[in-house]
Every structure is written in structure tokens, then in C-alpha cells.
Amino acid sequence: MKVAIIMGRGIEGCGVTKFTVEQTKWLANNGHEFVVYSSKDKSWTRKNSHDVSNVVQLKFAKPEEMNKMITGANEADVIIINSLPSIGHPEACIEQYKRFLNEITKPVVLIQHDHSKLSIRRNAAIEESVKRANVLFGHSKTNDFAKYVESVTGEAGLGSFLDEDTNGKSIIGFQPGIDFDAIRAKYWKPIEETDVDMHKWIGRTTSWKGYKQMFKFHNEYLRSAGAITTFEGIEKSPAYLAFREISEFNGHISEDIANISLQKNQPAYVFGPYINDELMERISKVGFGYQLSLLDTRFIERSIEYTHCELACAGVIPVFRKHYGERCTHRYYNKKLIDCDNTGTVWLDDENMQPAFDLVYKLSKDPVMRNEYREMAFEFFKLHQDSQYTFAEMMKHIEENI
């Protein structure tokens, strides 16, 4: 099958970009042809985070460049829209994208990565895209996107697809796949080469990523135990004004982490956006990696973030929010993550962080136990969200519904 992939928002360097990178790897490894088109009408802070050398970047606002995308998309068997232009894109870009929707002739798949209605409202031409799509994917069949689809199409947005002649549209849940084995082969270090005193949080300057909880854990538990905590991914966005009021920290957002001397018994060190490949190399050398995101149950279903997966792939001990484990269902075991055995994960409870610290401390003193834990985490999350399962499942749904 030949697939045309559209990144209407452009290369924003976050989840959708990572999804596209992993998606195209899976397509290539499984005998599919693909071409990726991305808008370059708007520039993003993290645009250099990933290698996107295989992406055709176009000015959507220019009709002659949009013509190239329309022609290329119509030469494919299916068109997958990974993201839409934002309402902040130039008006000409949005209008040309709408022309694209009207002039393409092949089946359309729309993958909506946003969770909440606030994020969904930032998408331009979303109603036109939903109505044009033959297949719709979302992180959850009960999230705000499902409600939006119901409001647009008059259907419930749940369950199996209805018969074609009813024009009913429902949401199919998806998980963003990643090639666990390939990432492990590139970054995983012997346990002797990991530094148990180093603790690394990765995320963005948005509150649901859990930076408040990381500050608390460092200030009240890790710092006095001789740990060094680094944050990576913090931008000086409007949300940074609130971020900097939460706790004291060593701010180095515009500096290279390699040039900073990290010392014990210090406030956490805070660094800015990263190049993914360089970050993964740094992660692979620390003892504990923190992904402390938390979303409401209706947004999650089975989906974990790419940064959850990357920690498990890199060979560190993953520390995740306990409440996330209580809300997310394992793809294979069909149980909440927290209720599964041998997760290899430290679950951090917002209300009582002592048990997580006790386990972190115990692991830091026992390299054999630590190695067993990270191996368990790798296998557990690979079975949950490896691309060999998730993208195969997605493609099966696409083939059955176009």
C-alpha cells in the first residue's frame, strides 16, 4: 500500500513528529511505500528535535506548492492526516488546506492526537477534516474528540463503524507505537555505566506533565539522599511564569547541559528543549528516569506517552505517576498497569511519596535488582506499546474501513 502522510501543523517536534518518525519506520519495515508532506508556514521551537530528512516541507499558503501535495496525495492508496494546521497558521495556509480536502480523491484517515477540547479548538479546519475522513483515530473513544465528532456528525463516536450508507463515524482508539528493540540497541548501557545518583525528568512546560511533583520529590526526598535531579524540555513559554514560582532551581534553559557542572545537595537543574537523539544518550546513563504526566481517565484508555516508552527503552528505572497506572489499561493483559505483575516501574503517589522513595533508595544500593527491574520494564512496556503491535493494529483498521 502507498501512503501519503500529512503534517498540517508542521514539524512541531513533540508527539506528532515522533509519531510520524516511528510510523514511517514501521511502514518501511513492513513493505509499504510512503511520502510525508509537512507545512512550513509556521516555525516551532522544537522543530530540530527529530531527524525529519524524509519529509517534504511545503508552504501550504502557496497554491503551486499545495498543488504538489494534492497531486502526490492522489497518487497514494490512502491519505493519513497526522495533524491539522493550527488556528495560528496564516489564513492562506488554512484556506489552501481546505482546498486540499476538496480536491483529494483517495480515502482519508484522520488521527487526532490532542486530548482536551481546549487543544482541539486550536485546530483549524477540524470540522471539514472530520467530515472528509473515512476513518478516525483518537487516544481514547471517550475523550473530547469523540464528543466533538458526535457534535459534528450526529453519531455517538463510540464502538464499531456503522454501515457506509449511514455516514456514521466513530473513533477507533490507538496507541502511538515505538520500536523498542531498535532504541534499546542504540542506547542501552551496562548497569555499571549508569549513575544511580542521577535522576532525570523529561517533559514540557505544561502542568499535566508533572513538574510540580518532580520538584516536590527532589526537594523533600532526593536532595537530602545525595541525588542530582535534572529537568529537560522546559521552554520559556507563558506557562514558565507559573513554573518558576513553584520551587527554587538552577536555571540553565538556554545553556548546553554538557557545559554545566552538576553538584549534589543543590536545587534541581532545569534545562530547555532538547535534540531527541542527544537526550536519549543522556537518559541511558542515569539511574532513574521520570515521566510524571497525568490525564483524566477518559483521555487515556490504553495510551502512554512516547516519553514513557523512551525511558523503558533506554535502560533506566522508570518512575511514573501511580494515578496514571491506575487509569491506563495494558494492551495485552487488559488490566490497569498498576495491577499487573513485573512492571519494573516505580509508581509515584502524589499523596504519599515515601514508598516510591524507599524503592528508589533500595534499587540504588542493589545493581542486580536494578538490572532486573529495568529488564522487566522493557518487556512489560514493549508488550504494551511496541510498534509491531500498535501500528499493525492501526493499519488493520484502516484496511478494513477504507
Task: Describe these PLM feature segments.
Residues I6-G13, V21, W26-A73, I234-Y240:
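N-terminal strand-loop element at the rim of the active site
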Residues G15, E351, S364-E399:
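A charged, aromatic-enriched C-terminal amphipathic alpha-helix characteristic of glycosyltransferases
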Residues M7-V21, G88, T206-K209, R298-R302:
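A short, glycine/small-residue-rich beta-strand->loop->alpha-helix junction that serves as a flexible
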Residues F137, I171-P176, R184, K189-K209, ...:
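Conserved donor-binding/catalytic core segment of Leloir-type glycosyltransferases
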Residues S119-S170, I178:
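A short, active-site helix/loop in glycosyltransferases that binds the activated sugar's phosphate group
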Residues Y290-E310, V319-Y332:
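Nucleotide-sugar-dependent
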Residues A242-I283, F288:
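Nucleotide-activated donor-binding/catalytic signature segment of Leloir-type glycosyltransferases, i.e.
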